[in-house]
Amino acid sequence: MTQPNDAAKPVQGAGRFDIWAPEAGTVTLLAGGERYEMGRRPGNGPADEGWWTAADAPTGADVDYGYLLDGDEIPLPDPRTRRQPEGVHALSRTFDPGAHRWQDAGWQGRELQGSVIYELHIGTFTPEGTLDAAAGKLDYLAGLGIDFIELLPVNAFNGTHNWGYDGVQWFAVHEGYGGPAAYQRFVDAAHAAGLGVIQDVVYNHLGPSGNYLPRYGPYLKHGEGNTWGDSVNLDGPGSDHVRQYILDNVAMWLRDYRVDGLRLDAVHALKDERAVHILEEFGALADALSSEGGRPLTLIAESDLNNPRLLYPRDVNGYGLAGQWSDDFHHAVHVNVSGETTGYYSDFDSLGALAKVLRDGFFHDGSYSSFRGRCHGRPINFSAVHPAALVVCSQNHDQIGNRATGDRLSQSLPYGSLALAAVLTLTGPFTPMLFMGEEYGATTPWQFFTSHPEPELGKATAEGRIREFERMGWDPAVVPDPQDPETFTRSKLDWAEASAGDHARLLELYRSLITLRRSTPELARLGFADTAVEFDDDARWLRYWRGGVQVVLNFADRPISLDRPGTALLLATDDAVRMDGVQVELPPLSAAVLRD
């Protein structure tokens, strides 16, 4: 059931069937096996244009329904469908979000600053691959010290398994994960465990199968595409309704499902030339809902533009978002622990790049990018942005999964190198994000997988993936077929690893680092001006200060000794670390956190 500006409000088992179909000549509702002719909704204002209504149809929960446009015989699913129990091509089913009896009345939410995020994919996080099964791991995550769980997209897609970025029904939760009721249970359980939930959402494109939005109206800009297909119509004719559709989806997650924030996928692909960018509207809506609900709500943008305007307040022409990803941190860490310098890693081949990121947030803040062949980014105004607004990681779903074989750092690097990456991520000035399994050095890959039922689409996806890496010099024989079910199965975590050998040792280090971060305010609370960095590229060491806390890292394959060791050893990644009043000694591939 769809009602303009109202999709995110609980229906409480009643309502009416409304649909926006401005180009249709006739619209028929098929509900509960009966047909109802719809009429144009009364009203002369722009908000009423193109809307059809069937006020006499039976309403309530668990009614199967769809729409027939211009005499069609096959009904289309609702663009705002909450449930698709038989798949994205089938009838929609009504769902009453108000039926869930929430148990989280005492939940006050969490602020981004000072928090640690854990990114996970429901389908591969547990053997069962469901929301209910993932809820069984919440105590583990709370014990690790996590504050926010960030879920990869859960909206409905065609097939049984997918990363989630091929979603076509933004208001529906994938039935294979348990559907919308399971999602509510998961959020409720997360809050009971003291964990916030951030939902990854995709508003820059729709998937290749099951996208019926163009049948209803000008949701897309045909011929104006991005990497994934036609762009969403944010600024053309009819875009007022399209924008409201998206804003209602934002409100649905934050209000109906009580999530604590959204991760906004690839906002650089949101083509919006209107005076008020839709990201600004997102920020204003989140602030309003935060005031209404009495808890913080966090919007985090994924952007490769290195543009701090995303974070600046709206009253100074910013978008007012709480955070954005910083790929530069990932690249600098990856190069210095792995030695890879190809492709977009080429500009980060020194400890100097890592030092600049730690000091300034971005490496490319107006500097020349050899990978792009042009200057890139702009500097951050330190008086307007706290370092915690930058979300950083040493691994994430993109940076692992978009490698040819989906290999993690832990599949090729020793404990010492993984420990260096962990220390940089969890003691640096930014908000750290872990990718599922990283904390124990998972050796299961995270590969690109799909399950398109259409043979031609599946074949095209697999061939395109192989061609992409063949152009980069990879042997096509080593690139996994995304349509092979084994590619999905291989990507599931093996939780038995977490208790064995160096896996258990690394897991204990992550717990200790998160505990130290929480108990040492300088690590998470100080601003950009409170970070100082020294390094020696030839000797391969780097150290930085956050107020009265010093972090020393040895990237070399030989021991080092440095002066000014501080007064107390707070944490070491290796038992062979030694310090006295004169020097601190670090074995190869090790780090220490010191109190000055």
Swiss-Prot record:
Q: Which UniProt keywords apply?
A: Carbohydrate metabolism, Cytoplasm, Glycosidase, Hydrolase
Compartment list? Cytoplasm
- UniProt EC number: 3.2.1.141
Q: Which reaction(s) are listed as its catalytic activity?
A: hydrolysis of (1->4)-alpha-D-glucosidic linkage in 4-alpha-D-[(1->4)-alpha-D-glucanosyl]n trehalose to yield trehalose and (1->4)-alpha-D-glucan
Organismal lineage: Bacteria, Pseudomonadati, Pseudomonadota, Alphaproteobacteria, Hyphomicrobiales
Q: Which pathway is this protein engaged in?
A: Glycan biosynthesis; trehalose biosynthesis
Q: Does the keyword Cytoplasm apply?
A: yes
Record NCBIfam families: trehalose_TreZ
Gene Ontology biological process: trehalose biosynthetic process
**Record-marked site positions (Transition state stabilizer):** 398
Can you supply one Gene Ontology CC term for this chain's record?
cytoplasm
Protein name as annotated: Malto-oligosyltrehalose trehalohydrolase
Q: Which residues bind substrate?
A: 263-268, 327-331, 397-402
- The keyword Repeat is annotated on this UniProt entry: no
Q: Which InterPro entries match?
A: DUF3459, Glyco_hydro_13_cat_dom, Glycoside_hydrolase_SF, Ig-like_fold, Ig_E-set, Trehalose_TreZ, Trehalose_TreZ_E-set_sf
Q: Which organism is it from?
A: Rhizobium sp. (strain M-11)
